Amino acid sequence: MSLTRRDFIKANAVPATAAAAGLATPAIAQPAKANIRWDKGVCRFCGTGCSVLVGVQDGRVVATQGDPDSPVNRGLNCIKGYFLSKIMYGEDRLTRPLLRMKDGKFDKNGEFQPISWDQAFDIMAEKWKEQLKKPDGVTRVGMFGSGQWTIWEGYAASKLYKAGFRSNNLDPNARHCMASAVAGFMRTFGIDEPMGCYDDIEQTDAFVLWGSNMAEMHPILWSRVTDRRLTHEGCKVAVLSTFEHRSFELADIPMVFTPQTDLAILNYICHYIISKNAYNKEFIDKHVNFKKGATDIGYGLRPTHALEKDQANAATPDKADPMTFDEFKAFVAEYTVEKVSKLSGVPADKLEALAKLYADPKVKVVSFWTMGFNQHTRGTWVNNMIYNVHLLMGKISEPGNSPFSLTGQPSACGTAREVGTFAHRLPADMVVMNDKHREIAERCWKLPAGTINPKIGYHAVLQHRMLKDGKLNAYWVMCTNNMQTAPNMNEEGYPGYRNPANFIVVSDPYPTVTALAADLILPTAMWMEKEGAYGNAERRTQFWAPEGQGSGRGRSDLWQIMEFSKRFKIEEVWPEELIAKKPELRGKTLFEVLYKNGQVDKFPLTELQAGFENDEAKAFGFYPQKGLFEEYASFGRGHAHDLAPFESYHKARGLRWPVVDGKETLWRFREGYDPYVKAGEGVKFYGKPDGKAWIFALPYAPAAESPDKDFDLWLSTGRVLEHWHSGSMTRRVPELHKSVPNAVLYMHPNDAAKRNLRNGDVVKVASRRGEVTTRIDTRGRNKPPEGLVFMPFFDESQLVNKLTLDATCPISKETDYKKCAVKVSKA
């Protein structure tokens, strides 16, 4: 028998990786079982978008492996990806709806008891109708969704809320991870998502990581970065972070900086480029405008907070005024290497070495960033400022030169951003505040004019505040564990969920912290149990077919959304004057208006893929995934967000939009690569009316909360390689749980010694908002500098978000999980 290279990779990659990690061999490395059907899928975890091969036997996923035909991961998976087959089969998987009850009826303080789906939707409909009939009813219902929703789940939810209930109180958990990236793109370019792609990795000369531990959070991309660094002569890697982590092992220019001073470092780089006369004058003259951003914008806290007082531009944080290049030059001139070195704690020679990488016109640079930038009280600013650097040099929109925002969730791009499940967005970068955009959406959705509410809904952090204040009363959480992952859960999150005025529904496959705080839990189908689509960080849309049997364990989010819509007649949710504009809708349900509208329901069951069980199609009598996708795609076709026909994605390993005439786009905004840039235009940032990107003058600003004599340490939160987000899936995989069973507090040995602590001691970590008990680790993979501690958030037994502050970027409304003040003492 002979093995092809592809077969060799399939046979050896999994056991080799498991052995290297010291874990038990995954199922795929065991002797092959008979009658296993293999098909392509997409990894359930981060935003890299790795393709996997999924093995199914008797309706159960029994094995997965990296897909050798994938252009993203090329046959590899990270350690989480190799155990994907086990995430759906935890012993505590939920199978029936559960309602808090006492004496046979709902009671907010009752115990969870199983009920039927009809009973669940009946009480949900009762609670929603009770709120919607109030004069301000549209503000009293809300939903918190997910960057883990499939594309059509997010789209269906957006239609239900923004069109059906006429409420924009829909926001995704991507608000906590990607909102600053979105705001940064929109402010600088007028259009969202990266202009480059992963192919940049193999064509660049230097990598700069800003607040990104790619070695653990995006390990497959890191393997490609490592390969480039080790095989391309002269290739350099710079890593900037507030603490040392595994990505530092490859760093030629390692930099640990004081929290929040990345703002100053970015301005120093611009100053260096201009002072050395290294900037690309021709590019700037043709393709850039300069803007002075508003300052004194606050910290996104409650208006009564002391930090929100006397903030002149808190109401208009996105404001920007024109300025000249010379004015920008003068603005950044104060950020000298001496000043920034003192402020940031980074030696001057390292700052200069970093600036030289960007300033050398012969060196192609890829800048990667993720939560260290985005989860920041000035998250939009730092996104704008990294674009400043690339735009000054013209190092953008071409192979190997790319500012690249990495994504944390599998479809934060494809669902949250592109579909527009944020409280202010519609599909294809449209927004609810724009009259023309609302008209387009109403036309696409076949709705009467004036249906969509022009008022922005409650964003994620505001939703918790409104729940606590009793102003948001019927609330549905789907595909996310927000009680564990949202900030300041003691003061804002938990009180809101348990407010007697509120009815909280959580759809989840497992009894998470969030589910256990709810009033009603709906069991959901997971991953390969349903037909799905994700969009990854490089604009790649990928599909998969339904492989497992979901109906016996739970119902998909899509089915739940569409089925719930049947409980509402138009007369119960729309005012009479709106119905009068389209009287033929009178008497119809929201299901008929939104999903059986002649567009979503136009694809019959005969178009389903043979050999796959589609529970939603069986339930509704048509192919809803195809209908929803094609209706959604109509928003972006011809508007630089073009998606290919539905069938194309089931055949391909994903396509990067815009897809025009069957061809995907690798680099946007540059002639020869982007079909929306005409011959002779060279570079065109067509998201802006004049085709020019914006460079912003934005200053250093201190953090919302810093260490003081009472709380003397910075706290930063984040993840580890073996677990993903809140651990609700990975902690149910025995091998992953065994490898890292609990979170620890990473601490500098000197900080431990000052407190008479030793490695492994049990400690109490306290902030002004709460406290947790954990163990300290002074010898681990993460090595904080003195004065800072780091703790992951995957462990539900140690809820680190009891400690965090709910400060946000005032522009993006994204939470800063990286900076608050704590004290540590022996427990």
Curated annotation (Swiss-Prot):
Keyword Nucleotide-binding among record annotations: no
Cofactor(s) essential for the protein: [4Fe-4S] cluster; Mo-bis(molybdopterin guanine dinucleotide)
Binding-site residues for substrate, renumbered to this chain: 793
Catalysed reactions, as listed in the record: 2 Fe(II)-[cytochrome] + nitrate + 2 H(+) = 2 Fe(III)-[cytochrome] + nitrite + H2O
PROSITE patterns per the UniProt record, alphabetical: 4FE4S_MOW_BIS_MGD, TAT
InterPro entries: Asp_de-COase-like_dom_sf, CT_Nitrate-R-NapA-like, MoPterin_dinucl-bd_dom, Mopterin_OxRdtase, Mopterin_OxRdtase_4Fe-4S_dom, Periplasm_NO3_reductase_lsu, Prok_molybdopt-oxidoreductase, TAT_signal
Residues reported to bind Mo-bis(molybdopterin guanine dinucleotide): 80, 148, 173, 177, 210-217, 241-245, 260-262, 371, 375, 481, 507-508, 530, 557, 717-726, 801, 818
Family matches, as CDD domains: MopB_CT_Nitrate-R-NapA-like (cd02791), MopB_Nitrate-R-NapA-like (cd02754)
A biological process term (GO) from this entry: nitrate assimilation
SMART domains: Molybdop_Fe4S4 (SM00926)
Enzyme Commission designation: 1.9.6.1
Role description: Catalytic subunit of the periplasmic nitrate reductase complex NapAB. Receives electrons from NapB and catalyzes the reduction of nitrate to nitrite.
Similarity field: Belongs to the prokaryotic molybdopterin-containing oxidoreductase family. NasA/NapA/NarB subfamily.
Protein name as annotated: Periplasmic nitrate reductase
Gene, per the UniProt record: napA
